[in-house]
Every structure is written in structure tokens, then in C-alpha cells.
UniProtKB/Swiss-Prot annotation:
Gene encoding the protein: rpsI
UniProt xrefs under SUPFAM superfamilies: Ribosomal protein S5 domain 2-like
Record carries keyword Ribosomal protein: yes
Membrane-spanning segments: none
Keyword Ribonucleoprotein: yes
One Pfam family, short name: Ribosomal_S9
Gene Ontology MF terms: RNA binding; structural constituent of ribosome
Gene3D superfamilies with a match to the protein in the record: 3.30.230.10
Highest taxon above the source species: Bacteria
GO CC field: cytosolic small ribosomal subunit
Species per Swiss-Prot/TrEMBL record: Helicobacter hepaticus (strain ATCC 51449 / 3B1)
GO BP term, pick one: translation
UniProt-recorded name of the protein: Small ribosomal subunit protein uS9
Length: 129
């Protein structure tokens, strides 16, 4: 199978993912998953979720580049990108990924600040007298 490309997004983070058939190597920003995320086990599981769900953790290689956002948002963007790449790799995986919500882009982003307010919704202190 040829290389499959997909992008995943979450908040301001973007993950560009290339998926090829191989032996289960993950290369994220030139590092392995353990080097990239260190001791964040819950976030590592989040990244591996689509691979474990489709039982492809030992049969595909993933090369990814992440931009913007923090570690958690980048990891969720990576999960979204891997899910989209697996869907393009084999359409049969869609039935496993779609019910878990892994192909859906999480559209929640930071609410903008409004004028006359201190933050998006926080008002200045009100004094009656």
C-alpha cells in the first residue's frame, strides 16, 4: 500500500500524518511517541486509541508533524489525523472509528474576548454605591 496522508485538527493544533504499511513505528516531530510525550501515559493512550481499536498498532508506520497548541491539543489532533488516515487506508475501519467519534473534528475553540469585559464572559466588578 502506498503512503496515505491526512490532517487532524484540535483547537489551534494541526497534525500532518503520513501512514504506510510497516512494523508499527511512530515518528512524531522526529521523535518516538515516548520521547515526544515523556511520562504522559493518558495522552499516549489517546494517540494510540485509533490504532488499538482497529488492531493496526503493529502493522502500520506513522510519520507525523505537529504544529501549534499544547501537548494535549497536539495529541488529540494527532489522534484525529491517524483516524482519518486509517479511514483512507481501509474503508472497513470507518465502521469501527465513526461510532467512537474519532473521525469527527472537535470544533470547540476558545471564545473570543468581548469589549467592555475582562475576558470572554468575566465582567468588571459591579458596585451598587
Amino acid at each position: 500500500m502506498a503512503k496515505v496522508y491526512a490532517t487532524g485538527k484540535r483547537k489551534t493544533a494541526i497534525a500532518k500524518v503520513w501512514l504506510t504499511s510497516g512494523s508499527g513505528k511512530l515518528n512524531i516531530n522526529g521523535q518516538s511517541l515516548n520521547d515526544w510525550l515523556g511520562g504522559h501515559e493518558a495522552i499516549k493512550m489517546k494517540v494510540m486509541q485509533p490504532l488499538i481499536l482497529t488492531k493496526q498498532e503493529k502493522s502500520v508506520d506513522i510519520h507525523a508533524v505537529t504544529l501549534g497548541g499544547g501537548y494535549s491539543a497536539q495529541a488529540e489532533a494527532l489522534r484525529h489525523g491517524i483516524s482519518k488516515a486509517l479511514n483512507a487506508y481501509d474503508v472497513a475501519f470507518r465502521a469501527m472509528l465513526k461510532p467512537k467519534g474519532l473521525l469527527t473534528r472537535d470544533s470547540r475553540v476558545v471564545e473570543r474576548k468581548k469589549y467592555g469585559k475582562r475576558k470572554a464572559r468575566r465582567s468588571p466588578q459591579f458596585s451598587k454605591r
